[in-house]
Each structure stands twice: as structure tokens, then as C-alpha cells.
Amino acid sequence: MSCVHYKFSSKLNYDTVTFDGLHISLCDLKKQIMGREKLKAADCDLQITNAQTKEEYTDDNALIPKNSSVIVRRIPIGGVKSTSKTYVISRTEPAMATTKAIDDSSASISLAQLTKTANLAEANASEEDKIKAMMSQSGHEYDPINYMKKPLGPPPPSYTCFRCGKPGHYIKNCPTNGDKNFESGPRIKKSTGIPRSFMMEVKDPNMKGAMLTNTGKYAIPTIDAEAYAIGKKEKPPFLPEEPSSSSEEDDPIPDELLCLICKDIMTDAVVIPCCGNSYCDECIRTALLESDEHTCPTCHQNDVSPDALIANKFLRQAVNNFKNETGYTKRLRKQLPPPPPPIPPPRPLIQRNLQPLMRSPISRQQDPLMIPVTSSSTHPAPSISSLTSNQSSLAPPVSGNPSSAPAPVPDITATVSISVHSEKSDGPFRDSDNKILPAAALASEHSKGTSSIAITALMEEKGYQVPVLGTPSLLGQSLLHGQLIPTTGPVRINTARPGGGRPGWEHSNKLGYLVSPPQQIRRGERSCYRSINRGRHHSERSQRTQGPSLPATPVFVPVPPPPLYPPPPHTLPLPPGVPPPQFSPQFPPGQPPPAGYSVPPPGFPPAPANLSTPWVSSGVQTAHSNTIPTTQAPPLSREEFYREQRRLKEEEKKKSKLDEFTNDFAKELMEYKKIQKERRRSFSRSKSPYSGSSYSRSSYTYSKSRSGSTRSRSYSRSFSRSHSRSYSRSPPYPRRGRGKSRNYRSRSRSHGYHRSRSRSPPYRRYHSRSRSPQAFRGQSPNKRNVPQGETEREYFNRYREVPPPYDMKAYYGRSVDFRDPFEKERYREWERKYREWYEKYYKGYAAGAQPRPSANRENFSPERFLPLNIRNSPFTRGRREDYVGGQSHRSRNIGSNYPEKLSARDGHNQKDNTKSKEKESENAPGDGKGNKHKKHRKRRKGEESEGFLNPELLETSRKSREPTGVEENKTDSLFVLPSRDDATPVRDEPMDAESITFKSVSEKDKRERDKPKAKGDKTKRKNDGSAVSKKENIVKPAKGPQEKVDGERERSPRSEPPIKKAKEETPKTDNTKSSSSSQKDEKITGTPRKAHSKSAKEHQETKPVKEEKVKKDYSKDVKSEKLTTKEEKAKKPNEKNKPLDNKGEKRKRKTEEKGVDKDFESSSMKISKLEVTEIVKPSPKRKMEPDTEKMDRTPEKDKISLSAPAKKIKLNRETGKKIGSTENISNTKEPSEKLESTSSKVKQEKVKGKVRRKVTGTEGSSSTLVDYTSTSSTGGSPVRKSEEKTDTKRTVIKTMEEYNNDNTAPAEDVIIMIQVPQSKWDKDDFESEEEDVKSTQPISSVGKPASVIKNVSTKPSNIVKYPEKESEPSEKIQKFTKDVSHEIIQHEVKSSKNSASSEKGKTKDRDYSVLEKENPEKRKNSTQPEKESNLDRLNEQGNFKSLSQSSKEARTSDKHDSTRASSNKDFTPNRDKKTDYDTREYSSSKRRDEKNELTRRKDSPSRNKDSASGQKNKPREERDLPKKGTGDSKKSNSSPSRDRKPHDHKATYDTKRPNEETKSVDKNPCKDREKHVLEARNNKESSGNKLLYILNPPETQVEKEQITGQIDKSTVKPKPQLSHSSRLSSDLTRETDEAAFEPDYNESDSESNVSVKEEESSGNISKDLKDKIVEKAKESLDTAAVVQVGISRNQSHSSPSVSPSRSHSPSGSQTRSHSSSASSAESQDSKKKKKKKEKKKHKKHKKHKKHKKHAGTEVELEKSQKHKHKKKKSKKNKDKEKEKEKDDQKVKSVTV
């Protein structure tokens, strides 16, 4: 910037004027100076004189050069003679003072003059001046000052003066410039740029806004003309406006969105725990803090801590939706606060309307909600009076039910009706319908009842919800008082809420769509409908599902104020109004769920409140989530939802009855809504044969996130959005029992009912799946039992036209089988009606408000109530850790991915639940724990039969939850469950402290209770029924242990929140996944709604297996849980990454599985069996049980797996966590996963990514999990191997069950192969790796997990199969097998870990293998007794692998063809697997004989297989690492830490291995061939892991059964699981005890153990074979890489990874290398064939899974029992392996 310095002559200092250019004109300088000095041109003129030359500038155009100094004088305008002598005398003075002295002034002209001199050469100036003048002159035209020439001369003819408007002169020359009297006419703008079509001509140029067009005519924009015609007042932009009739009256803020305190739209809506009402966070905190005793402004309960406030995410979402839709600004609404109180009554009206619409009984039920309406809107006097009566009873509790106060009669029925009617008339909905009227009535009530209604609204929000509670008071005002009587009443209250719910739609309307009365009617009705769907349907459904709980749903969010009836504050926040009210009904009055609810129902209501508007779940959903979710809390949510929604809902009524209902009422409401949302999303994601696809479609918006992330998360969103969309979805939903729930999902709002009714049990499950639904579910377990069934059912019918679904009792108490055509049809009809209604009135609102609430609901309700501990990050999975039973569910939603993932899982689980429900309804009668448990058990069995592990899981969790939480901690547990489930997702800020408090108290207590109860339930369920009890027992034990672990986690997080929570927070995301998996299982047993919600999606497939595993693992988990906490911590990070993979793979698999689902349904049972076997394998006990159970459930599981690979993964992950505690389970599970991989290889990959990641993350804590998933079998990526090394510390020697049994916390020492060490260092290492691996793992996992899983699958699957047939012996064997498997897993894990870090170990392993070659002799002698059992186990495992990869006979022949046979075997095995699969189903005895035969054959091959598996493990880990990194290159790099040595060794040993392989083939043809087959299979699996796994599981299960026969024989002996199935029969004994563990370590180190074990059995041949294997592995790597590239990049990575890993890990890769070399040539063909076969087997796998599910359940108990035995033996081996693993870990840490 140039500048000129000026100073007034009277001043001493110069000021500066800056300008652009080299010069500034005098005119401009004057203007600038005058401007700077604030002088006015009219006052004076300025005289500018050059300070150096004393030259006075007179010409305005004179240019003053920059940096000049001038002196300024003020002179009169006329001008004055210069008083200074600086006039132009002076050309004598130098222009620049700096140059010539002033002495020379006479001789030189000033520079200023010089610059104007044309002839500088002759000028009288110094050369410097001349130069400067020349420079100035030359640059003058370029001076910016001169850029724009001043207009000179006449302007162009078209130019008109801007002042006078006349042409001929510029404005500066305008003759009127001096004329002060001249007033220029109004300037007419030109319509430049405005299309003529947008303009309308006007004749009057003076018309406002008239513009001159280019045609010379005047026109104004059409829109302006319209606006002018309307005559809008133009107000200052920021002046507070009075509520305009158009905006305020047309789109009044829904009452549910109004804060009861400030009467304005809620900002940062929070739910107060006492009464479930929602307020602005600031308002309620201020009110509480300003009151002396922290008195609730609505229910006047004292000591309500502001920290207990739960963020009402649903309501917040509703508010956001409302604001977005209406452009509402709080300022405007501030004057609307009075209406809010009236609005609460309208909400009951809406509910009432809805209920009448839905069904009159519900309307009556809605009466409690109606009570507020009574006072608010008196027009429907009769209705109001009845409502008032009912509400009166509630109103007193409300203590602020002015409207209901008039008729504080406890006649809820009357109240509801009145409320509905009055609100109807009041609300804008009046236009649309009585239902619609509520909105109108609401609006009118707003205006007329502002004071009284304001109070009423406030009271309704406070007292209304209390009335909702009061309705429970119908059911028992105690419920209203917080006692939440487990009767239909509470649900009715919610139902009554529906009367209030009318405002609900209206409020939903207002909430989300407050746009205009018509819109409100349209939207409001839709909103109300949606609210009803969300709130009431949620509530009712939830209530239905939860039984009475759902009646609160009628209060459902649609009538936020009525919803307030449960929690008055929730009136506004309860846009749907129901959730908070429901919460209130459950918690608000006397018995806020503070104790029961970690975060009281309000916690739920807050989130529900937010979602409430969109869902009517804000309050209702919250209430649902909290209230109903407990009822629905059973993690059966998905499958149960699908299969047994009605039955489960009825069961929920039965199970929790009133207590559960009351406690879980709000939770269930919220959770139910969430579940609805999630279900819708989850359905789509699930793409299960069940309405999964429908679900996802309905909630497609959420489907994306669900698919991408955890089901629960997107599920929650889906819930909210899906609610509105779900209507269209409903047809798909009805596909299963859950189909109804799907349809139900279609009616997002209506969801509540459905949920309550069909899903209450599933809801529990679903609760775990979805945050919000979890909230519902949390209560669902309780609510489920609530008698609301009938009313709710009616209400449900009204909305759904499915009386049973509406009837909570009918739904819960009496198992309403959605499979029942009539029930299904009723539900569909109701759904159709509801959809129509919803679409008519609520769709817009649902679309806007619901979608977000869905996520919020899921997250909010489940997680919100999750104790803060778990919910450090409300939506992180971390919470799930704390959710032992219910928080896991939340965590599912939470788990970062999991909010969606849970959603996805929830969707899957819901789908599965539908099936599970249906099947479980069939099997409902025999439940271990009372009706609920029986139903859950039966549902689980039904689910197993149906092939849904998720249903079982949900059922299990529900059972566990309900039995443990409901029966033992009926209120507390339920509350805790709701709180966990609801608090975590919903709890935003307020819930944190209280959440922690509640969690520490209730959740911790619950977990503690659940721990004993889980254990007690274990025994209880065991006593309750061998099969059912076993299933449940296993689930229960899992819950107990896991809950204990979760309790520990919970406590840990509390006691060490910074450290543990920080740890858990990162892991929590994973742990929320893994925890939501583990805890999903835990919560499946305990409060698995949320975990199920999240995990359900991931684990839909995994869940069936996982459930069983969890059942088995739960026994183990009791001991293992503590480690599992660590493991889960580690796992959580892994899981975090894995869920991503899981999502991708899940989607992949879902797509594949969805397509395959139905095709596989028949074969699903077979494959399911295998998959279950595989999954169960990780924990032989569990596997045994899951074998049966999974055989039954495998179809379902397969469906789940196929539909929800992530779920399966999650199950695996969670089981993996547990298995992480017990590597045996890990081993078992890996086979299971392999088997499952067959059906869901991608899923397996996800699981592996996740499970492995779990192992990685939780390797320290539960490395076994990873092991079983990725390296458990024998294939672990270097990451895995590192993890496994850490795991080796735990030395999976301790089975999960062992670990669980050792719940005392043998974690550090026992490390139980849970590999707690890895949790610590591997966790971080692997977390980062896992993230990389997760990105690559889906690819690598596809291949690797397949090989690993396949091998493991083969081993444990056989074991599992054996358990199926001989559950007890099998379980023993399985236990041993688990131990062995655990060892193997740990060794393999170590191998995997050591594959990179212990590739050193490879040399070491070679030494090991040499040693173990020698040792085999010794061990053979030492462990000959175990040899047979181990042989059987190894045979079982190996044969299982062989069978899973090929028929045993085919494999035997293929084995003989060692190298060539491997590819052929791989191909035949796949076919044979199918054959064996069929054979297995048709001739299990034959299979057993075959198994014995093949076992003998495979005794050596089994070891080889294990070695191959170990190699696979390593390669898999290498793959994992490569996946982490870049795939194969990273395999080399990552694996280099672990596998590089193997690579180097491989180079050396590759030749050796082929030689050894030849020797091994010579010496042990079977063994070598088995190895080759294994290797080939591994390669094939790598390349075609999916297909292979699919094929393998069937065959594996056939093998299992055959091997089971063998194991039956050897069952007594199997001490440790065949740590390496590939060990020879001679080695089997050894490996059973010491050898097994040592080899595990070796394998863990660099899979040396596998090869060592093989070497033990093969002797030096093993070593040679190892080298051969290395060579072949390299060969196979190349071929596998090529083949896998052909197969898929994932598989390509996986296969090459497997092969290189095999090559890389000579020790661990010995056998694997054999397989690799064997399969190297055949790898391409094998992999291709395997892929095809696996696809085929995928289908079969599902069937087998279904069959196995049933068998697995029964076997699970035995497995759990055997796990204890195994634990003992595993402990011994564990100590040995610990030492080895420590060494390996050291190596691994070095390599890492």
C-alpha cells in the first residue's frame, strides 16, 4: 500500500493516508483526510501543501506521489489565500527533502514539478530527481490510480444521470448537485437477470417492487406480487415476533416437543428418571438445582440428581426434525409454551385416537394417558371423564395433572377414551380424524388450556406420564409410582398414553412436522401414527411384546404430554409422548427405576423422548426401551422378534409380568421402538430368509448404516426412519413370525405394539440389538410379562390389527406364534392398517423424526440407560462391556459401528427373532426359567430349530435376563437392563453420572446378581431341562459369567474409569461389539437387548453359534469372563476394526447369504449344524451344546450368519471374547466359524477380522476368541499369531468354560489362551494392525478364516458333532478338545502370533518340531491315555476338518493321495462335506463310524490338519497382518515379524518340508495326506474360504458326527482338545495333555506346535513335511494367490496369505505347508471348487446349523460341564503353554 503522510498545520505529528498506486489525486486525498478526520465537506475545504516543496496543490486532479508528506489546513469552502508562504514561490525548494538540501531549491524544480515536465533532459533538476521523475512518468499510466479513468466529456447517449435521471451528464456534473431542494425520484430498478416468466407486468411504476424491464414496461416478480398481495408485515429481522398464526397456529410445536418448564420447544431434551418426563436440559437442571431438595417439577419426587437426567435423543431428534421441517426457531415458540401443557393431554388424545383407531380396548388403556387430555381438552367430556378418571388415578401420582385432576379417577379406561377424544377434538388431527383431532385438540387445547392445560401438559408431561404410570396403576399405580406393576395396566397406561398419544402424532406432528395444521394433520396423524407406531406401537407393541409394558406405548410418544404421564417432564420430550410416559409409568412415581434402571426409565425416556416424536418413542420409546425393552429386552429381539414376536411378547408378559413390565416398561417402550426401527433396518440388513431383507428395506436409510455398521446402530436410525418407511416394509416383515414384526417395523410408530407383542421377548433380544429397542427390550423382559398383552394387543390390533401382537400377555404370556398364519395375518392386517394410518398421518413425521430417533432411540434408549460406565461414550461399544445383560445390547448400538451395527444386528436378530419367536413359540413350553425362560428356551430351541442363533441368543439373553434379571433381579435387573440398554444409547450427558451410579449399583448389582444368577440360572436352567436348561444354562452361565465379567468391566470402568474406561472405550467400541457380542451373549443371557441389538446384526449368523458358544462359554465365561473383560477390552479394538470388516463382509455375506438363505434353509440345517458345530467348536462344551443347538438353530443361524455375517462374527467375536477367555472355545469356535464360514465365509472373515481382531484386541484378554476365529483352528494371521502369543499366555489351555468357571480371575496366570497378554500389548498392536487387517481382513479373512476356520471347524465341528450325539462324553471330549483346541488355538494363536514374532519360533518351532518329534514319542508314551481321546478329538477336529473339507472316506482316499489328494480332497471334501453333511443328517451313526475310520486315518492327518491349521493360523495371521497392511506384501511384512522368519526358514525349510512332507507322506500317508488335504483345503479355504467353509461346515459336521462317534469312544479321554487336530492319533494322547499344550505353544510361536505335534506324530518326517509344506506353502501361495485372485481378492489375499503364512511359519506351517504344497497345485482348482462347494455347503451349512442348534443346545450343557473338566486339564496345559506362550509372546513382542 502506498501512503501519503499528512499533518494539520496545527499538529506536530503526521498521520498517514494509504492508497493503491503510485500517486493519489488531490481530490481523493482530501476525501480520505476528511474521512479520517471526520470532517464534513460542507464545513470547510482543505488546503494541501507539500511539506517539502511547500507547493500547494490546487488542482483536484493533481497527483501527489506516494510517500509524500503534506500539510493540511482547513479553509472556508470559498477558499482563502494561502496564509503560508509555501505557495508556489518555491520551485526553488527540492521536491525531495532527502535529496538536495533546501539550499539548492532555487536551482532545481520540485520533483512534483519534474514529474509533470515533459522534457526531463533539459529540466533544471538533479539527475536523481530526473530519474525519479522519469520513473514516475513512465509508470504513471500504469498507476492503479489511473486504472479507471475518470469520466470526462459527455457521457454516452444512453447514460442517464443517477441523480436527476436525465442524460447528458454524469452525476458528479449533475446540475442539481448544489440544489438542496432537489429530490430525486424513486429509482426504478431494472429487472436484469430475472426471467420474464417469473415476472408479472404492472402498469404503475410506483408499485412496490416494480422494475423496469428491457422492454420498457414495469414488472414485479410474481412471488413478490403474491407476497405483497398478502400484505406481509416486514418486520426487523431480529425482533422477537409474536407467534404468527401461520407458523405458530398452523404448526404448533407438538406438546411432546415442548418443555414442561419453559413451555418452549425443548433444547437438549433430557428425561428425568423419576417420572420420565422430558425437559430442556437447562430448564430441568436449573429447576432441580434451584429446588432445595432437587424436586422434580412434575412428579415432585425429591433427590432427583441432575446427573441422573438422561439425554432424550429421540426427543432431540424429534425437535431437530421439527425445527428442520418447520424452520421453527425457539424464540418464536417461547410464546407457545402454554400450549405444551395442553398438548400433553392431546398426546393422550392422540394415543386415544390412535387407540380407537387401533382398537377401542387400547383407547381405554390409553385412558390413563387420556387423563391429561381430560383436563386439557374437555370437549370429549365422556372420554375425558373416563380418561380423567383413569388419569386421575394417575394424575394424583402425577401431582401435576390439572387436566386429569378434575377426574382423578383410576379408571384408566375411561380416562384413555376421554383423553383420546378430547385431544382428538383439540388437536389439529381433528380434521383428519378423531385420531387427528387430537392434534387439533392439542392445538386448541394449547390455546385454551394454556394455563390449565399448560399445567396439565406439564402435569401430563409430569403427571401424564405419571398417569401412564398411573395406567400401570390401573395395572397398579405402583408402576406409576415407579413400581410399574407388571400388569397390562402399565402397558395400558402407555396405551392410555396413546390417547395422549393423539398429541403424540400431533406432537410427533408438531415435533417432527409442525409445519401446518393440515400438514400437522397429515403429518401429525402420520406422526401420531408413527408416534403411535413408534411410541404407541412401540409402546403397545413393546408393551405387547412386553405385555403391559406396551400400554405405555399407547401413551407412546405420539402424545408426548401423555407420555409424560409416565414421566411428566417427558411430555414435551415425549413427542410421541409414550416413551417417557412409559418410563414414568414404570419408573416415575413411586419407583423411579433409579435402582432397577441403571439409568432410570427416564434415561430411556430421554432418548425415547427424542425419538419419541418421530417414534412416539421419545418418551414411549424411551419408556419402551426402558420399560418395554426389559420386557422386550430379551436379546431374542431379532430372531425372537421375527419368529416369536407374539409369543415372546406374551412371554415377556409372562416372564416379567408386571414387575418386569414396570421395570422394563419404559425401556421396552423405547427399545421396542428402537427394535421397530432396528428391526426395520435390521430386517433389511438381515436379509435373512426372515424378513431381514424386508427389514432392511423398510429401514433402508438405516439399512445402509446397518449394513455398513453394526445393525444396532443403523438399526436405531432405521428404527426411527424405518418406522415411517416400515409400512411399506411390513409385507416383507411378515415373512416370519417376525415378519409381523417387520410389518410392524413398517409402521415405525406402530412398532411399539408389535414390538411389545411379538417382540417383547425378542425385544429383549432385540433390545440388545438395538439401542432404543434395547431400552424397550431392557424393559421388554419385564414388560413382556406385563399383562398389557390384551389391551396392548387390542391396541396393537387397532394399529396392527393383530390382537395377539397387541396383547402383551397373549403375546408374552401365551406364546403368540407369529408363525401362526392367523396371528401373522392379524399382525399384517394391523400393520397394513397401521401403515396406512401411519403413511397417512405419521409418515412424514416418521420419516423426518423417526429416522434419527431410530439411531438415537437405539443408541439412546439402550445405551442411555446403560450405566455411564459402560456408556462413557454413549454410543461407543465400550458400554457394552458394562452391559452384561442389557448393556451389551446397548453397546451393540453403541459400538461406533455398532450403533448402526447393532441396528443391523438387531435387524438380523429381529429377523432371526421372528423365526426364533415362531420356532420358540413352538418350543416355548419348555423353558428353563418359568414361562419366560421356558419360552425363551423354547424359542431358543425354536430358533435353533429354525436355525436362528439369534433368536436363541435373544431368547437366551432374555431368559438370562429375565430369569436372572427378571426373576432374581426382576425389578432391579429389569431396570438395570432397561437402564443399561436404554441408558447407554440414550444417555447423553445427564445419564453419565447417574448412569454410572445406576450402573454401578443396578447394573453392577444386576451383573453381580446375574453372575450368581447366571450361575444359578445355569444350574436352574440345567435343572429346568437338560436340553433347554442346558441351552439356557449355557446362555445363563454365559450371562452370569459375562455379566460378571461385565460387572467387572462395569466395576473396572467405575473403579478405574480413566484407565479401564479408556481402555474399554477403545475396546468398548470393539467391546461394545465384542462386548456387545460377548455381552450380547452375556446379555442374551442377562440383558442382551442391546448387545443383541448390535451384536444381533453382526451375530445374526454368529449369534446362533455364539449363543451356544456363549452358553458354553458362559460356563467358561464365568471364569473366563474376568479375563474376558481384558480380552474384550483388547477385543473391542479388534472388534472395532472387525465390525467394519464385519459390516463389509456382513453385507457381502448378507447378500450372499440372503440369496443363499432361503436356498440354504433346507441345507441350512445341515450347514447350520456344521456352522454351529464350528461355532460351537471353540468351546467344545459349548460346542457340544451348540452342536445340538446349532444343528437345530444352524439353519437359523446360517440364516443369521448368512443374513448377518457380522452378527455371526459378532457372535463369534463375543463368543470369541468368551473364547478369548477359553481358547478351546476359540478353537471350537473357529471351526464353528469355519463351518460358519462355509455358510458365511465373508462373515467368518468379518468374524475373523473381528474375532481375530478380538483375539488381537482381546488376545490379552480373550485372544482365544481371535484364535478360534482366525487362528483358533490353526490358521492365524501374524496379527493373530501375535495375539495368539499373548493368548498363549493365557494358553487357551483354559477353555472358555474353564476360564468362566475360573471366574475367580485366573486371567493373568491362566491367561487361558484367552491371551490376556495380547490384550495388553497385542491389543494396541493389533488394534492398529487389526484396523489395517480389518480393512484387509475381510479379504484375507475370506480366505484365511476359511482355512483356519475350516481346519478348526473341522476339528471342533467334529467335536461339536460328537457332542450333539454324545453331548456328555462329547462335551468332555469337547472340553478336552476345547482344551486341546484351546491349546491349539493358543498354540496356533501363538503360531499365528509367532508366525511373525515367532517366526523366530519357526526355527524354534522346527526345533520344537524336532523336539516334539522326539517328544511325540515321549508324549505318546506319556499321554497315550489321552491319546485316544485326543486322537478322537484330533480325529474329530482333523476329521471334522477333513470331513468339512471332504468326506472322511473321500479324504482318506484323498489323504492317500497326499499332495494330489489335497486338492482332490478339498474338492471332494467339499462335496463329501455335503455328502457327509447329508450323511451326517441321515446317518450320524454311519458318520460316526466314518468318523472313527477317518479319525483313525486322520489321526495323523488330524495332526497334520492341525499343523496345517496352525500354518493356516499363521498364514491367516499373516493374512491378517497383510490385510492390515497391504495383503500379501504385508503378509510378508507383517507376517515377517511373525512370518518373516518363517519365510527365511521357509526358504531353508521349504526344501526340507517337501522332503519332510514326502517322508511324512511316506511314513504317515494318511497324516501327510491329511496334511496335504488340510493344506490344500487351507489353500482352498483361503481361496474359497467362504465356499469351503460353507462346504466344510456340512462335512465338518458330518465329520463331527462321525468323529463324535469316535469321540464318544475317546470322549472319556479327551483332556485338552486336540490342540492340533492335525496331530496323529499317537500324538493325540500327548497333545491332549502336555504335548497338546506344548504344540499349542509351538504352534502359537510359529505354529511349530502344530508341526511339532505333527512331528511328534510324524517324527522327523514332520520336519521334512514341514519343509515340504513350506515349499508347498510357497507353491500354494503362488497358486493360492493366483487361485485366490481368481476366487476373490479377499480370498486371494487370504489364500496367498495362508500359503505364505504356511510357508512363513515352518513350525506352525509344517502341516500347513503340506496342505499348501498339496493344495498349491490344486489350490486353484481346489479353491475354485471349494468356492463352489462352499457355496453349496453354505446352504447345507445353514441346515446343519439348524439341526446342530438343537443338538448344540443340549450339548452345550454337557460342554459347559465338560468345560470345567477341560479347564482343569487346560489349566495344567495352560501353565505349560503359558510358559511357552510367554516365550512366544516375548518373541512375538520382539517381532511385533
From Swiss-Prot:
Q: Which organism is it from?
A: Homo sapiens
Q: Where is the composition biased (Basic and acidic residues)?
A: 645-675, 790-799, 902-922, 955-971, 979-990, 1001-1017, 1041-1071, 1095-1161, 1182-1200, 1230-1248, 1280-1290, 1362-1391, 1399-1435, 1448-1459, 1468-1506, 1514-1580, 1751-1760, 1774-1792
GO molecular function terms listed in the Swiss-Prot or TrEMBL record: protein kinase binding; RNA binding; ubiquitin protein ligase activity; ubiquitin-protein transferase activity; zinc ion binding
According to the UniProt entry, which residue ranges have a biased composition of type Low complexity? Answer: 374-393, 685-719, 1692-1723
Query: So what does this thing catalyse?
Result: S-ubiquitinyl-[E2 ubiquitin-conjugating enzyme]-L-cysteine + [acceptor protein]-L-lysine = [E2 ubiquitin-conjugating enzyme]-L-cysteine + N(6)-ubiquitinyl-[acceptor protein]-L-lysine
Residue numbers spanned by region Interaction with RB1: 982-1139
How is the protein modified post-translationally, according to the record?
A: Phosphorylated by NEK6.
Gene Ontology CC terms, in alphabetical order: centrosome; chromosome; cytosol; nuclear speck; nucleolus; nucleus; protein-containing complex
Q: What is this protein called?
A: E3 ubiquitin-protein ligase RBBP6
Q: Residue positions of the PTM Phosphothreonine?
A: 984, 1271, 1468
- Numbered residues of crosslink Glycyl lysine isopeptide (Lys-Gly) (interchain with G-Cter in SUMO2): 1106, 1169
Pathway listed:
Protein modification; protein ubiquitination
- Record field: compositional bias (Pro residues): 336-347, 557-601
Q: Where is this region: Interaction with p53?
A: 1433-1544
Which compartments is it annotated to reside in? Nucleus, Nucleolus; Chromosome; Cytoplasm, Cytoskeleton, Microtubule organizing center, Centrosome
Q: Which SUPFAM superfamilies match?
A: Retrovirus zinc finger-like domains, RING/U-box
The record's note on its domains: Contains a N-terminus DWNN domain, a zinc-finger domain and a C4C4 zinc-binding RING finger domain. The ring finger may indeed be a U-box domain.
Tell me, in a sentence or two, what this protein's role is: E3 ubiquitin-protein ligase which promotes ubiquitination of YBX1, leading to its degradation by the proteasome. May play a role as a scaffold protein to promote the assembly of the p53/TP53-MDM2 complex, resulting in increase of MDM2-mediated ubiquitination and degradation of p53/TP53; may function as negative regulator of p53/TP53, leading to both apoptosis and cell growth. Regulates DNA-replication and the stability of chromosomal common fragile sites (CFSs) in a ZBTB38- and MCM10-dependent manner.
Please note every region of biased composition (Polar residues): 621-634, 1258-1276, 1436-1447, 1618-1627
The family database entries (Gene3D superfamilies) matched by this protein are listed as: Phosphatidylinositol 3-kinase Catalytic Subunit, Chain A, domain 1, Zinc finger, CCHC-type, Zinc/RING finger domain, C3HC4 (zinc finger)
